[in-house]
A protein has these predicted regions:
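Catalytic-core environment of secreted peptidases
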Residues: 1-47
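Residue-level signal for short, function-critical loop segments
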Residues: 3, 50-52, 163
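Glycine-rich, flexible loop/turn motifs
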Residues: 14, 36, 58, 169, ...
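Residue-level preference for long, well-ordered alpha-helices that form the structural scaffold
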Residues: 17-20, 24, 51, 105-110, ...
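Solvent-exposed, polar/charged alpha-helical surfaces in well-ordered, non-transmembrane soluble domains
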Residues: 25-33, 37, 60, 64, ...
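Metal-dependent peptidase/peptidase-like ectodomains
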Residues: 39, 49-153, 157
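Generic secondary-structure signature for well-ordered alpha-helical cores
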Residues: 40, 122, 209-213
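Active-site-adjacent mobile loop/cap segments within catalytic or ligand-binding domains
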Residues: 72, 77, 83-95, 99, ...
Length: 217
């Protein structure tokens, strides 16, 4: 579940990590648990993908082998999301951001998707930018994670990504030191780390409600 970037991991190769991407798997499972407790208008599938580093093989296979007469209304992707709003970074570090990128839809639908994000962030969750927390969303197509398998096939996607605010994380990226202790330290404690996860779960759940309540156009 690691993110594939266009430079060489400092540790040489890859390693299963807490931020990249056990964090994304954790959020996915928490959201799935919340969604499973209610009835919805649309069928919901939760997935953890294999072989992202080898070329998005798991997600690409899923998209390529959908059952006949089935389609995908929207897809949410969580990749490297530990350090985000409202966690305050240590002194001297850059802001911990909440970033959401939309892709895979026509212009009108992308505008609607971005408006949903704005409504959730500003009106429903009452989040706001601070010097320590940058909140941003935009339509953007980047193939750094499994959402690429979906938006390149014209399925609407929301990609959640929080880089961690500064260059220090990339010293741990794809190495054995990307572990829970490291992430707790960067978050200033386990409670703060939990607050960041709660941001993602509630934001994505509210977005899901907007998606489910619309028709299939």
């Amino acid at each position: 579940f690691d993110v594939a970037y266009a430079f060489t991991p400092p540790g040489g190769g890859t390693s299963e990590g807490a931020n990249d991407d056990t964090s994304g798997s954790t959020v996915s499972m928490e959201v799935a648990q919340a969604i499973a407790s209610r009835e919805w208008d649309h069928t919901v599938a939760a997935a953890l993908w294999a072989c992202e580093e080898e070329g998005l093989l798991g997600s690409a296979a899923f998209v390529s082998h959908l059952p006949e007469n089935q389609s995908i209304k929207a897809y949410m992707n969580f990749d490297m999301v530990s350090l985000n709003y409202p966690i305050v970074p240590p002194p001297g570090y850059g802001p911990y951001d909440l970033g959401i990128a939309t892709a895979g839809a026509n212009e009108d639908n992308l505008s609607q998707m971005n408006e949903w994000v704005r409504m959730v962030v500003e009106d429903e969750m009452s989040f706001s930018d601070t010097p320590q927390n940058d909140i941003h969303w935009a339509s953007e197509e980047t193939c750094a994670s499994d959402h690429c398998s979906f938006f390149t096939n014209d399925y609407a996607t929301f990609n959640f990504f929080s880089a961690g605010g500064d260059i220090s994380f990339w010293q741990e990226w794809h190495s054995g030191t990307d572990n829970l202790d490291f992430m707790v330290t960067k978050a200033g404690g386990s409670d703060n780390l939990g607050d960041g996860f709660n941001t993602l779960v509630w934001t994505s759940l509210n977005l899901f409600i907007h998606i489910d309540n619309t028709d299939d156009s």
